[in-house]
Swiss-Prot record:
Lineage: superkingdom: Viruses
Localization annotation: Virion
Cellular component per GO, a single term: virion component
UniProt KW keywords: Virion
Protein name, per record: Virion protein 5
């Protein structure tokens, strides 16, 4: 097995998650997705597409973490429990390599779509939020 510094893949323990300039602790997963609004272009006389065109970029990121007693995502100002969402500005969510400090992927201009929490007997309480973002990149 290679030492952490010589590993060729990212693992959950070689990256950290930042929202704004704050490291977000106890995160369990972050899943980003992009859709391109791909549409087939068809013509009379064939059921086969002649080409594909990209019509609309849509990106989402879902963050799941253990819910902290004093610093849940709403109290941190990242999301909200009600109409206070109207006071929230867009945010940037960045995954950083904790060895090189390079950006793995940055989600820019994030706005919350949903926020939920889960309370289950004999389990750690969790919270989840989904954002839509304007763009993603590997640069600052």
């Amino acid at each position: 097995m290679a030492s952490v510094g010589n590993q060729t893949v990212h693992t959950g323990n070689t990256v950290y998650l930042m929202i704004g300039n704050k490291i977000i602790g106890r995160a369990q997963s972050a899943s980003g997705e992009r859709q391109y609004g791909t549409q087939g272009i068809y013509e009379i006389g064939s059921i086969m597409p002649q080409e594909h065109v990209y019509l609309k970029y849509e990106g989402t990121i879902t963050l799941e973490r253990m819910r902290m007693k004093k610093e849940d995502l709403a109290s941190l100002g990242i999301t909200a429990l009600g109409e206070d969402i109207l006071q929230r500005d867009i945010i940037d969510i960045v995954m950083m390599d904790n060895l090189t400090k390079e950006i793995v992927v940055a989600y820019r201009g994030c706005s919350a779509i949903s926020y939920s929490e889960s309370f289950t007997a004999n389990e750690v309480t969790s919270e989840s939020t989904q954002f839509t973002y304007l763009t993603s990149a590997k640069v600052k």
